[in-house]
């Protein structure tokens, strides 16, 4: 495996499950990661923090963790802080990058300040006068819009709003998941894309063409009719520029090692970054394995390469 001795990893916990709205996705990701690591000869074991205390990791001699948790405390810096406390190396971003990366509202504030293009948006707080806010938002941003809880992943509770009358019900639904809701102008005309990041690997950008309105939870993890275009149809020079911009969007949030940066193109080819993902899904529907396969890297090789990023100083 690329010159890496699987014994160099020591005893590895694959963190999976957890207690967020994305538990089932995490279980699916984690089981595949576990199988891939074991097939490569890594001494790896499943560990569900919703069922066992994290202190057991230290007590049972784990020295490294592959974080396959999605959303909630698995992705918002809490697990990362606990692993730092116990001295256990782990995949993905640290506390700051994880916390910022899961928070769409604060991500967009950082990007705006640093000139990373992102769709125009407004933030709505739980308890606001939704009717008054909706009227002002439609007047300012127009339609269609996307309504997103600030800190849920896998497109949980993301709603596309096409009419002014639909915005208030969408806000009422989204605030069930988070006290801050992002209402974002929908970027139309050029499609949805993702740039996968894994150390220094040069992975291709993927164009995502869902059968439905947008790349929602169903399209990501259930449907078989979502199309993934590799190559993505962007000219090589422009794709290289967008990869560099995606890496910058990832880095300025304090994110490290591996993840994804998702963006839209408008009808003129301008990119608008939507969010990053610091603990991407690793199911058979997920994007990083697809990008890796396109350049000849198997699932097993990918999970070992990601885990190997924990060996660096």
From Swiss-Prot:
It is found in: Cytoplasm. Residues 108-308 form the ATP-grasp domain. Coiled coil: none annotated. Its EC number is 6.3.2.4. Pathway: Cell wall biogenesis; peptidoglycan biosynthesis. One of its GO terms (cellular component) is cytosol. Signal peptide: none annotated. One of its GO terms (molecular function) is metal ion binding. Mg(2+) 1 binds at residues 262, 275. Binds 2 magnesium or manganese ions per subunit. One of its GO terms (biological process) is cell wall organization. Its cofactor is Mg(2+); Mn(2+). The keyword Cytoplasm applies. The keyword ATP-binding applies. Mg(2+) 2 binds at residues 275, 277. ATP binds at residues 138-193. Pfam families: Dala_Dala_lig_C, Dala_Dala_lig_N. PANTHER family: D-ALANINE--D-ALANINE LIGASE, D-ALANINE--D-ALANINE LIGASE B. Belongs to the D-alanine--D-alanine ligase family. NCBIfam families: D_ala_D_alaTIGR (TIGR01205), PRK01372.1 (NF002378). Cell wall formation. HAMAP family: Dala_Dala_lig. This is D-alanine--D-alanine ligase. It comes from Paraburkholderia phymatum (strain DSM 17167 / CIP 108236 / LMG 21445 / STM815) (Burkholderia phymatum). The lineage of its organism: Bacteria, Pseudomonadati, Pseudomonadota, Betaproteobacteria, Burkholderiales.
């Amino acid at each position: 495996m690329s010159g890496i001795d699987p014994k160099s990893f020591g005893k590895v916990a694959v963190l999976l499950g957890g207690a967020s709205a994305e538990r089932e996705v995490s279980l699916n990701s984690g089981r595949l990661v576990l199988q891939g690591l074991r097939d490569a000869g890594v001494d790896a074991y499943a560990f569900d923090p919703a069922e066992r205390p994290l202190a057991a990791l230290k007590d049972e001699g784990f020295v490294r963790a592959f974080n396959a948790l999605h959303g909630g405390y698995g992705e918002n810096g809490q697990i990362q802080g606990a692993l730092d406390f116990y001295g256990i190396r782990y995949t993905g971003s640290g506390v700051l990058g994880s916390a910022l990366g899961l928070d769409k509202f604060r991500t967009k504030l950082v990007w705006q300040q640093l000139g990373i293009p992102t769709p125009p948006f407004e933030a709505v707080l739980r308890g606001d006068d939704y009717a008054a806010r909706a009227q002002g938002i439609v007047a300012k941003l127009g339609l269609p819009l996307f309504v997103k809880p600030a800190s849920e992943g896998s497109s949980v509770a993301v709603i596309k709003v096409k009419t002014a009358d639909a915005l208030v019900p969408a806000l009422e639904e989204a605030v069930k998941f988070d006290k801050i809701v992002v209402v974002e102008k929908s970027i139309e005309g050029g499609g949805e894309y993702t740039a996968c990041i894994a150390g220094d690997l040069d992975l291709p950008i993927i164009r995502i063409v869902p059968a439905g309105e947008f790349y929602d939870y169903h399209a990501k993890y259930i449907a078989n009719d979502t199309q993934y275009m590799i190559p993505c149809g962007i000219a090589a020079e422009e794709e290289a520029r967008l990869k560099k911009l995606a890496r910058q969007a990832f880095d300025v949030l304090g994110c490290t090692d591996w993840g994804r940066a998702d963006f839209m193109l408008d009808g003129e080819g301008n990119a608008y970054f939507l969010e990053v993902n610091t603990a991407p899904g690793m199911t058979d529907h997920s994007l990083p394995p697809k990008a890796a396969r396109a350049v000849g890297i198997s699932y097993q090789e990918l999970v070992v390469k990601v885990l190997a990023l924990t060996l660096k100083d």
